[in-house]
C-alpha cells in the first residue's frame, strides 16, 4: 500500500470515529484510533501513517511520537479533507 492511499484511509477513519472540537474541526483521540478493530486491520503502522499525514499538514497533534497507553488522550485533529 502506498503512503497517499494510507493517509486517505486515515482521513476516512477520522471522519468515522471523530467529532467536532471547539474550533469546529474534526478530531479523535489517539487511543480511539489505535484500539479500533477496523483501524488495526487497515494500518500496518498507524503511527507511521499519522507522521506522514502530519508532514503533509493533513492532521496535527501534540508531540512527534505517539505511544499506545502513554498518549491515548492526545487529540488527532484533521486540518484538511
Curated annotation (Swiss-Prot):
Keywords linked to the UniProt accession: Acetylation
Pfam families xref list: Costars
InterPro entries: Costars (IPR044302), Costars_dom (IPR027817), Costars_sf (IPR038095)
Taxonomy, superkingdom: Eukaryota
Residues with the N-acetylmethionine modification: 1
PANTHER family associated with the record: COSTARS FAMILY PROTEIN ABRACL
Family affiliation: Belongs to the costars family.
Protein name: Costars family protein ABRACL
Amino acid at each position: 500500500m502506498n503512503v497517499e492511499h494510507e493517509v486517505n484511509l486515515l482521513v476516512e477513519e477520522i471522519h468515522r470515529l471523530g467529532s467536532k472540537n471547539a474550533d469546529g474541526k474534526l478530531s479523535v483521540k489517539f487511543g480511539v484510533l489505535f484500539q479500533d478493530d477496523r483501524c488495526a486491520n487497515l494500518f500496518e503502522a498507524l503511527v507511521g501513517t499519522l507522521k506522514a499525514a502530519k508532514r503533509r499538514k493533513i492532521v496535527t497533534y501534540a508531540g512527534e511520537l505517539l505511544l499506545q497507553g502513554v498518549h491515548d488522550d492526545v487529540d488527532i485533529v484533521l486540518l484538511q479533507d
